[in-house]
Regions:
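Intrinsically disordered or highly flexible coil/loop and linker segments, enriched in small
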Residues: 16, 40, 127-136, 188-192, ...
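Extracellular structured ligand-interaction cores
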Residues: 95, 192, 287
């Protein structure tokens, strides 16, 4: 089943209207799957289904050596205990309102399916909006949408390992510094590590690789070959910006970005299954009005397992 068919099954307009706009469990599951599949960084995350506004996830681990030399007939007198802790997901409510004028229904070239087509477009945009909040959310932001929650960037800066590139340009050194910042215990599952980067950072890094006068360098200029550093893939995330502004050492920058390094399984998203798509009419404005409502949350399972490089100039 294609993504379009999956979404169409999840958002059968007639069924939604009959149900008062509340998606049934099967529709919710399909819509949530669609949202995740249309994302990039969030697609790598472990998605936690939620039936309440908040949910706690139990963590268990052993933080130090637990083995000792064995001696016959002797009690080692040392017993390690697992460490228990919790991650709390606290959802925020998001509404996506939109409207379609009567003229669109009357004069479009798609025909009777125009409503479903437009709803699918907005569903795709919702996936992008969710991922933007997961990554760029900051409760101190002046942006009323982004201030809903602290996202992966903010958590990485405040609870993870921060490397300040101080306005320097795209380079292999940035990725190397991040790898150095990450505690060694998180390098054991090396294959799960990912660098999450902006499209312009990826482009700049591929240009560096492409300067090598070898076939290995050519492939980064001539194909969509995924770039790596020390065997760790770079994942291009369209919603990571490359136009952040900051004054660094008295010099204003308008082309800054950041890079996040973490294991994929360290990323967590939560979404409440009580999703709604409601519809109404404004007969005076001659419009049909719609509202998607969702509740979402995000976290790292272990903030200590993330490193972030800030203040990278993509044109320096």
């Amino acid at each position: 089943m294609t993504q379009a068919e999956l979404l169409q099954k999840a958002l059968e307009t007639a069924d939604l209207i009959a149900g008062g706009g509340l998606l049934n469990p099967e529709q919710s599951d399909k819509f949530i799957t669609y949202l995740q599949d249309m994302s990039v960084m969030a697609k790598d995350a472990r998605q936690i289904p939620m039936k309440a506004k908040k949910r706690e996830i139990n963590k268990i681990g052993v933080g130090q050596r637990a083995s000792v030399p064995a001696a016959e007939g002797q009690d080692p007198a040392l017993r390690q205990k697992p460490n228990f802790s919790k991650v709390e997901l606290d959802t925020v409510e998001i509404m996506t309102p939109f409207e379609i004028t009567y003229d669109v229904f009357e004069d479009n070239i798609i025909g009777e399916n125009i409503e479903d087509e437009i709803i699918q477009l907005f569903a795709t945009q919702i996936a992008t909006d969710h991922e933007e909040l997961y990554i760029m959310g900051d409760k101190t932001s002046s942006d009323t949408y982004l201030k809903l929650l602290d996202g992966w960037r903010k958590i990485a800066k405040t609870q993870g390992h921060l490397y300040d590139h101080a306005g320097g340009g795209v380079s292999t050194a940035v990725l190397g510094e991040l790898l150095d910042e990450l505690p060694e215990k998180y390098l054991r599952d090396y294959a799960d590590l990912r660098y999450y980067v902006s499209p312009k950072f990826e482009h700049g890094y591929k240009r560096i690789l492409g300067q090598r006068p070898t076939p290995a360098g050519d492939k980064f200029l001539l194909s969509e070959e995924q770039a790596t550093y020390a065997g760790i893939p770079l994942v291009r995330v369209p919603v990571i910006p490359s136009n952040l502004q900051e004054v660094i050492g008295g010099t204003p920058y308008e082309d800054l970005t950041f890079v996040i390094l973490t294991p994929r399984k360290n990323l967590i998203t939560g979404i409440h299954r009580a999703l709604t798509l409601e519809r109404d009419k404004n007969i005076f404005a001659r419009t049909r009005q719609y509202a998607f409502t969702t509740r979402i949350a995000c976290a790292y399972e272990e903030p200590d397992a993330v490193a972030i490089a800030e203040q990278i100039s993509v044109v320096s």
